[in-house]
Amino acid sequence: MQTTNLAKIVAAAALVAVPLAISSISVAQAPPPRPPPIMAPSIPPAHLLDLMTAQGSAALGAQWRVSDVKIVEVPAIQGAMPQYKTTYNIEPKAGSTDFDDSKWPVIEPKDLAARRSGGHVAFMWYRSPLTIPAKIGEFDPSGAVAVLSVTVDDYAEVWVNGAIPGRSGYPSPATIQGHNMPQRVVLSTSVKAGDKFQIAVFGINGPISMAPANTVWFREAKMEFYK
């Protein structure tokens, strides 16, 4: 009798442990939280770099690489309605910090303005590392708020160190702002010499539902410093 009761207790404990284990696995597999969005200052910057010039990009050690983006058919997600057998994804997914872009062509900063893609439903990746120097000419950037400001024709999403800064329910400058609108993303509220940022800009031709006969290109790319 005691053996039977013991077996029942063990079985019940095992059943309780299963959802706990599943819950633990789910938590372990959850993606890390995105960094919160920070609104850029609205005052004039103490110093400004034009990253579409050789001099401006060189000041931050930028090396711009570019890649076309393909739309590929993939199986539908788990739990999709039965009529949906396939869906679409993009290749490559190049937002992560450790993405290998070594085979992508390097472009000159001025060629960020080149009109790329074949138009219509079209996307482009632009990637570059940025490193804060001890001095930019006579300007000392230490302690400054550093803001990356880009305007992509027509839309963009901006990845910083492997993430799109943002939080559900809050505005984020790293996400689509509007048609040909500047996106001013705070990289740090207090930079120091040697700080590194891996930037990945996902350029989008739009309006997407119109699929216009336009291309993807940078209208501007700047680094702003505020003190």
Question: Which residues does each predicted region cover?
Answer:
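Signal peptide processing junction and immediate N-terminal pro/mature segment
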Residues: 21-32
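An acidic-aromatic loop/edge-strand motif
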Residues: 33-91, 104, 187-227
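Bacterial N-terminal signal peptides that target proteins for export
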Residues: 2-13
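Bacterial N-terminal signal peptides
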Residues: 11-23
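Surface-exposed coil/turn segments at beta-strand junctions on protein surfaces, enriched
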Residues: 121, 141, 178-180, 191-194
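Solvent-exposed beta-strand/loop surfaces of large extracellular or lumenal domains
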Residues: 160-184
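Beta-strand-rich interaction surfaces with strong enrichment in secreted/lumenal proteins
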Residues: 113-119, 127-129, 173, 186-191
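Aromatic-lined ligand-binding clefts that engage carbohydrates, nucleic acids, or primary amines
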Residues: 104, 122, 130, 135-162, ...
